[in-house]
């Protein structure tokens, strides 16, 4: 009996040991399965991470571009860093320079007609590098897309109103950003317009708020001028007109909706051609009939006529001598500044001050316009105007 007990006991021990070994093997197998499962999951995770990295790279690639909406309402995708710029037929050279604080970097080409204007203003001295850029086109109707492509620009700036031109430019595959002039983006107020140009340049270069202080400084000048004009009685505010061009003895005046019309509105002058839409051809007799009290002459690039030409009656085909504006020597030429002053430009607040001061001299008798201009140029364009340059601005 004892022998059976010993045998049973031995068998029980063996069974227990076998069960233990089996458990160990099962644990080992389970561990191996878990490790394999974890390894598989790790591999799956790693494999799933791969496309995530690609997506990240895509985002980085997207970060290398910037999508903006221009004044034509088009969404434009631009490279993050812009190093080569072509400016087509839109007069933003001076605003571009002001945006860059007295310099004009990255411009590799622009319209030759714009260069002709720049050559007649102080802009050529502030940013002489502009004179080295290529001429991509010359006349308003010229367009040589092949020459533009050769310059390898990152972006082309163009007149947002000119849809036909955009169609040609955009086919180059080069991003095109439209800047509003007349007929786009609401009313053509020159002061508001140059501010809109500056803001769009902030979008283009990804520098939101860069020109905020500059624009605020301009607003301060504008407010001062507005307050002075407000002191002038309505009955003492004159009638006037802006002679925009004079082509082959045919006068073209600034009618309703033009930059010139908005300038006259700002200074409280009644435009004698306010019922004429846009820049309109009129005959000399119509001007005689309207007989404005003040005659403003447009400036470089548009009208090659000076105050002395008019006062001394030297203009072929136009006898100014019987006009009240001439008799009273109320004729003013906008030669001043870094651009044609009656179109949008960063001198806008100064233009406003000048127009108001010549129109209402009594209200501005203590206003130091020349000092204001000098300070403005030094602060915002990093340029010290000489007395000779100031005198030349007013030699009109």
Q: Predicted segment positions?
A:
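Alpha-helical, coiled-coil/dimerization segments enriched in small aliphatic residues
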Residues: 252-279
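Extracytoplasmic ligand-binding site segments that recognize negatively charged/polar headgroups
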Residues: 115-119, 162-167, 179-199, 232-259
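A short, structured surface patch at a secondary-structure boundary
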Residues: 88-89, 93-147, 155
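C-terminal motif of bacterial Sec signal peptides marking the signal peptidase cleavage site
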Residues: 19-23
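Bacterial Sec-exported substrate-binding components of ABC uptake systems
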Residues: 4-8, 24-97, 209-242, 365-396
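Structural recognition of the beta-strand scaffold that forms the well-ordered cores
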Residues: 84-88, 108-111, 155-159, 176-180, ...
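Structured C-terminal subdomain patch of bacterial secreted/periplasmic proteins
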Residues: 188-208, 212-216, 303-396
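Proline-aspartate-enriched helix->loop->beta-strand connector
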Residues: 135-140, 144-158, 284-300
């Amino acid at each position: 009996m004892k022998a059976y007990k010993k045998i049973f006991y031995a068998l029980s021990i063996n069974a227990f040991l076998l069960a233990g070994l089996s458990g160990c093997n099962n644990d080992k197998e389970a561990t191996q399965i878990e490790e394999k499962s974890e390894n598989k999951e790790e591999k799956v995770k790693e494999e799933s991470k791969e496309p995530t990295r690609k997506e990240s790279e895509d985002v980085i690639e997207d970060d290398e571009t910037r999508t903006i909406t221009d004044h034509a309402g088009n969404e434009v995708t631009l490279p993050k860093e812009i190093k080569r710029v072509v400016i087509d037929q839109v007069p933003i050279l001076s605003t571009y320079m002001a945006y860059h604080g007295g310099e004009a970097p990255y411009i590799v080409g622009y319209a030759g007609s714009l260069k002709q204007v720049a050559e007649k203003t102080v802009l050529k001295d502030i940013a002489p590098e502009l004179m080295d850029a290529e001429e991509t086109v010359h006349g308003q109707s010229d367009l040589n897309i092949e020459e533009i492509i050769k310059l390898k620009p990152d972006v082309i700036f163009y007149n947002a109103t000119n849809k036909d031109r955009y169609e040609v430019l955009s086919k180059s595959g080069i991003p095109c950003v439209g800047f509003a002039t007349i007929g786009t983006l609401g009313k053509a107020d020159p002061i508001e317009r140059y501010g809109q140009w500056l803001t769009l340049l902030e979008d283009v270069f990804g520098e939101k708020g860069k020109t905020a202080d500059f624009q605020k400084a301009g607003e301060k000048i504008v407010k001062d001028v507005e307050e002075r004009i407000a002191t002038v009685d309505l009955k003492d505010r004159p009638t006037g007109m802006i002679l925009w061009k004079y082509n082959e003895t045919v006068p073209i005046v600034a009618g309703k909706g033009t930059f010139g019309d908005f300038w006259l509105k700002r200074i409280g002058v009644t435009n004698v051609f306010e019922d004429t839409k846009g820049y309109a051809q009129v005959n000399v007799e119509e001007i005689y009939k309207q007989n404005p009290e003040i005659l403003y002459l447009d400036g470089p690039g548009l009208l090659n006529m000076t105050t002395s030409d008019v006062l001394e009656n030297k203009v072929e085909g136009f006898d100014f001598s019987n006009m009240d504006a001439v008799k009273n020597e109320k004729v003013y030429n906008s030669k001043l500044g870094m651009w044609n002053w009656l179109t949008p430009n960063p001198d806008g607040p100064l233009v406003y001050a000048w127009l108001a001061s010549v129109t209402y001299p009594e209200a501005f008798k203590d206003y130091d316009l020349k000092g204001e201009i000098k300070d403005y140029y030094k602060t915002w364009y990093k340029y010290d105007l000489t007395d000779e340059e100031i005198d030349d601005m007013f030699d009109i």
